[in-house]
């Protein structure tokens, strides 16, 4: 399948990591596209020297434009599938082949970073579970990780007409695939976090998720949460028996928390229940 899969990578001021990532993808060089998204450091020069194909934007357009640019390039060059991964070192390129294999059976593959919770900060576990369960409420899909940017997908009409801005496109893409009846799976990938670090969630990311969710479900609770966020207040939400608390921080971020024992049980089901063992 390799010859039909475009590997597209967004890069914004990644001079510290981009050469390492591209070197690890040398075996797939002719299938790789780098989208230099308005970098102001030496990222573009390093990509040029590497000899990889790239497109440069004069300003930083963000993730929605990245997907649009990548899809247009893929269609123009007759690719049937696409894999995306970040250029900041958080996604291990050695897993690209795992995504390619899974794409032979699924329409969308999302990377799952939550196989070893001992190396993931509790706040990150809570915020990811919040997004996963909200996605379940919308479409009934049960996945361990719904926000990972390391993903593979079949290029289809599902992608048409994106109007979602900022991080919301990551969720909208998933919801569109599920709504269309596509087969969605996941690939386990390593998480690169330090468990003692505190990972707060940016307000823009939360608002993006909630705004996309509102397009698929009529639930007044989401409106109430958005009002609290606008007022920079803490909020709580209960989803499928899991209680979430989000504390507003002065840095315009929220710190999520939940019952870690229950959260661990949620993620363990993907290890023990054959229904979820998609690898």
Positions of predicted regions on the chain:
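Short, well-formed alpha-helical segments that are part of the catalytic scaffolds
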Residues: 12-27
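Short beta-strand-to-loop acidic/aromatic patch adjacent to the donor-nucleotide binding site
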Residues: 79-90
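A conserved acidic beta->alpha catalytic loop
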Residues: 36-44, 89
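Short loop->beta transition adjacent to catalytic acidic/histidine clusters or analogous donor-positioning motifs
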Residues: 2-5, 25-34, 42
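Hydrophobic helical membrane-anchoring modules
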Residues: 1, 164-279
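Short hydrophobic beta-strand elements that form part
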Residues: 6-10, 56
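Acidic helix N-cap motif at the loop->helix transition within catalytic regions
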Residues: 16-20, 41-49
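Acceptor/aglycone-binding surface of glycosyltransferases and processive sugar-polymer synthases
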Residues: 59-73, 93-167, 194-203
